[in-house]
């Protein structure tokens, strides 16, 4: 038809004419065509923004709308052009930082709209200055997985003694989440100014000691990047320090942290070494010298328990004597292992750590852990080390929900050992509420259960709830953004956590909205590479909250009371003396809440939002006489908001925390709180009818350091008197003397019902002083499948004791064994062993 020899423009004209001719022919001809013209598809209306572009000094919430019926709106906030793959609009968009918002509308039967764009310059007020912290309760802990935080020294990325375990793309595009990625102690040191800017009180670093040096898994790699597969607890891992496994990088980190007023908490593993039958086969070294492997551990006094994997995590015997996930399970009551583990903790203390997070304490021998706490309580240390005066802070991991069978055991363990717990029971509710949008009543019910107080006599109540370590994300569970929280949800969770009772812990990267949802976001995908260290709306919020914790003792040490609640709204109050902080959170994404009937301890007056509306908060007016139920004038609590109202006032002597909570006479303790006065008053210990004043080595308005006086062992209280005012009586457990672990075994037990437990009680406080209740007696005794009973108890070294076993029945009644009391003399050192037969 055509000869193709035209230029590009000419060809376009010819083809257009040809197309028109073919169209006319298909319509039945030329000028006589009477068919309708082609239909033109209309374009959807351009989206409208509820807030005009411009500069603002408060947080803005922008609603999007479109006049096209049934339109869907997609938007971006990162400067990219929106498409149908962008975020689908569902609720007003909170803006707390300068943002360019772009939106596109789509609708069935319409072409996509034009893109609407608006730039919002948000210049929020600077956060208040953060005062110097005298106690960890006044700030928050920042948890770091060292390998995933920052690479500060590339020379240790692929060390020769453990070559081939490094992914060079880990921080950019990881190929293997089980390899080392390069984060190290030098990297944390180099980011100290970032941590200080947020008001971090302490960093909790993953175990820094030497881990296995070979692949312990299949070809895809299994390494100890996380720190929980130790081989030598006396050396620093070469990936975190240097090839000499020296302490230089660790010491540098501690020095830098202390210079910025930040404490260092080391994660410590006492339960196990490393995988059995793979890698290094449960290798155990002592400062470079091989002690044993799992397979060669065949002596008369084995270092390990050679037992099956735990199959029932609510079985007391399995937990303490079986194997956790094929990791070589240390026998803490082997005398060498006992001294090795305690020596490793003292070694870390001598290198400047300020406390420990104890891994898997539910799976370690419970009775031995009492003696480990006592060893740390009796550590004297160098006066140049902060932990020598502000005593080491201990907390441990016991995964248990309040509805689980061993929850009462966990409460008893914490109350009587002096080891604080990670508040896992509260965590489960926080993950539900902020991650899965469940009702706030879950949190409130949990707090009511846990915080009933030691005087309640219930097996559910913690003696010192303000010592529990709280969190909503960690390295073992999916981050709440994976569970469903958006950025505002994370900030609301932060707001709750940092104003709730307890010592709050933020997981690294939460402030940068870090998450990876692969595999449900659990291990290892919750151990992401830290991608940013910049300031944003979340770091600003943290600064506000850190300043509040530091400045107002009600948040660090006060009581906590629910004031108003429904599924989406939680209003609660912290109080210490005349210091009051009232917090209101509305997590509903679209509905404001009318608040009526709210009472408060805040004095009458008008209160602006402490957060300066950076979380969409509002002001309130309090009326009535000063008291516990001052009415708040009805007000509207905005959706997706957090409001905080603060009153700062006087406070008499008030004890918030004692560290440690259990110690023997002669040990040093730190009493923290407020209102102690600048001049020394009187610090008193009361046990039974006896009250003895303690000699204070340090006295300030918020902290006292003193030596436990010679006083009767057992449950005691501590008070501070300043002038005519005396503080609350804080619970304290006085140990008789230095403790060591003793294995008590009993054979010939009577037949037991499903609700029976075997307990031990005896002649000293550490054996229960002949008490018979669940909380008073010692135990329950573990029941090996081979028969009999086994229980490790930490008792006074060198003591002569008497004791008996008893059966505590489900109805509270007791059956003692018959006959005379058993007698034993406890050795002066090491580990004791006492075996008896049940007396019928």
Q: Residue locations for each model-derived region?
A:
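Short, compositionally stereotyped local motifs that mark structural "simplifiers"
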Residues: 36-126
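Bacterial Sec-dependent N-terminal signal peptides
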Residues: 2, 15-46, 124-126, 130
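Substrate-binding/active-site clefts of carbohydrate-active enzymes
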Residues: 133-140, 147-351, 371-384, 389-407, ...
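Beta-strand/beta-sandwich contexts
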Residues: 649-680, 725-737
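Surface-exposed, short loops/turns at beta-strand junctions within beta-sandwich domains
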Residues: 93-99, 710-714, 796-799
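Active-site-proximal helices and loops of the catalytic beta/alpha 8
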Residues: 253-262, 272, 343-350, 354-464, ...
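Aromatic-rich carbohydrate-binding modules that target alpha-glucans
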Residues: 81-87, 750-800, 808-827
């Amino acid at each position: 038809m055509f000869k193709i020899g035209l230029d590009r423009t000419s060809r376009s004209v010819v083809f257009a004419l040809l197309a028109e001719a073919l169209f006319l022919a298909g319509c039945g001809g030329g000028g006589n065509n009477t068919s309708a013209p082609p239909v033109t598809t209309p374009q959807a209306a351009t989206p409208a923004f509820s807030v005009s572009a411009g500069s603002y000094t408060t947080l803005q919430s922008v609603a999007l709308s479109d006049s096209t019926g049934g339109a869907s709106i997609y938007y971006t906030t990162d400067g990219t052009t929106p498409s149908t793959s962008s975020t689908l609009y569902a609720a007003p968009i909170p803006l707390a930082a300068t943002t360019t918002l772009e939106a596109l509308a789509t609708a069935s039967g319409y072409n996509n709209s034009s893109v609407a764009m608006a730039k919002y310059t948000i210049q929020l007020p600077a956060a208040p200055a953060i005062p110097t912290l005298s106690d960890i309760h006044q700030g928050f802990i920042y948890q770091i997985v060292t390998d995933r935080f920052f690479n500060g020294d590339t020379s240790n990325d692929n060390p020769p003694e453990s070559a081939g375990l490094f992914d060079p793309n880990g921080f950019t595009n990881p190929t293997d989440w089980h390899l080392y990625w390069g984060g190290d102690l030098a990297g944390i040191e180099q980011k100290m100014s970032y941590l200080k800017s947020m008001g971090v009180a302490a960093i909790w670093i993953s175990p820094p000691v030497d881990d296995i040096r070979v692949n312990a898994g299949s070809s895809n790699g299994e390494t100890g990047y996380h720190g929980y597969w130790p081989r030598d607890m006396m050396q620093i891992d070469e990936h975190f320090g240097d090839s000499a496994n020296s302490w230089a990088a660790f010491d540098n980190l501690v020095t830098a942290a202390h210079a910025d007023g930040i404490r260092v908490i080391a994660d410590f593993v006492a339960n196990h070494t490393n995988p059995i039958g793979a890698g290094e086969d449960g290798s155990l070294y002592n400062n470079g010298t091989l002690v044993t492997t799992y397979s060669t551990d065949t002596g008369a006094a084995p270092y390990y328990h050679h037992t099956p994997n735990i199959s029932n995590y609510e079985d007391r015997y399995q937990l303490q004597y079986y194997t956790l996930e094929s990791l070589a399970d240390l026998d803490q009551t082997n005398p060498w292992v006992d001294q090795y583990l305690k020596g490793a903790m003292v070694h870390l203390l001598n290198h400047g750590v300020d406390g420990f997070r104890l891994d898997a304490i539910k799976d370690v021998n419970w009775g031995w852990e009492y003696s480990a706490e006592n060893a740390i309580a009796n550590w004297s240390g160098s006066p140049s080390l902060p932990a020598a005066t502000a005593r080491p802070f201990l907390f441990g991991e016991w995964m248990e929900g309040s509805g689980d069978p061993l929850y009462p055991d966990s409460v008893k363990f914490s109350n009587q050992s002096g080891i604080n717990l990670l508040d896992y029971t509260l965590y489960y509710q926080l993950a539900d509420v902020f991650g899965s949008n469940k009702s706030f009543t879950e949190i409130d019910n949990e707090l009511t259960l846990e915080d009933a107080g030691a005087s309640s006599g219930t097996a559910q109540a913690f003696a010192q709830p303000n010592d529990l370590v709280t969190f909503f994300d960690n390295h073992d569970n999916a981050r709440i953004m994976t569970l469903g929280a958006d950025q505002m949800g994370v900030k609301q969770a932060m707001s709750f956590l940092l104003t709730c009772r307890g010592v709050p812990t933020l997981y690294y990267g939460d402030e940068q909205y870090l998450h990876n949802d692969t595999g449900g976001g659990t291990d290892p995908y919750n151990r992401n590479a830290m991608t940013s260290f910049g300031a944003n709306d979340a770091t600003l919020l943290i600064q506000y909250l850190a300043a509040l914790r530091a400045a107002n003792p009600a948040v660090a040490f006060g009581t906590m009371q629910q004031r108003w609640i429904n599924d989406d709204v939680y209003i609660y109050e912290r109080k210490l003396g005349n210091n009051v902080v009232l917090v209101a959170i509305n997590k509903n994404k679209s509905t404001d809440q009318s608040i009526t009937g709210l009472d408060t301890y805040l004095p009458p007056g008008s209160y602006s939002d402490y957060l300066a509306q950076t979380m969409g908060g509002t002001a309130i007016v309090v009326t009535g006489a000063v008291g516990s139920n001052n009415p708040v004038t009805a007000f509207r609590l905005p959706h997706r908001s957090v409001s905080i109202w603060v009153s700062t006032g006087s406070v008499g002597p008030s004890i918030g925390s004692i560290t440690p909570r259990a110690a023997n006479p002669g040990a040093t303790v730190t009493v923290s709180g407020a209102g102690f006065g600048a001049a020394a008053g009187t610090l008193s210990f009361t046990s039974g009818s006896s009250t003895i004043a303690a000699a204070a080595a340090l006295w300030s308005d918020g902290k006292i350091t003193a030596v436990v006086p010679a006083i009767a062992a057992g449950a005691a209280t501590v008070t501070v008197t300043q002038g005519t005012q005396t503080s609350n009586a804080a619970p304290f457990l006085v140990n008789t003397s230095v403790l060591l672990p003793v294995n008590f075994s009993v054979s010939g037990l009577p037949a037991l019902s499903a609700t029976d437990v075997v307990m031990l009680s005896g002649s000293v406080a550490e054996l229960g002083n002949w008490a018979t209740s669940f909380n008073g007696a010692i135990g329950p005794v573990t029941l090996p499948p081979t028969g009999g009973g086994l229980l490790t108890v930490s008792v006074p070294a060198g003591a002569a004791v008497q004791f008996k076993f008893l059966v505590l029945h489900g109805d509270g009644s007791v059956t003692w064994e018959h006959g005379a009391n058993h007698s034993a003399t406890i050795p002066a050192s090491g580990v004791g062993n006492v075996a008896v037969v049940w007396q019928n």
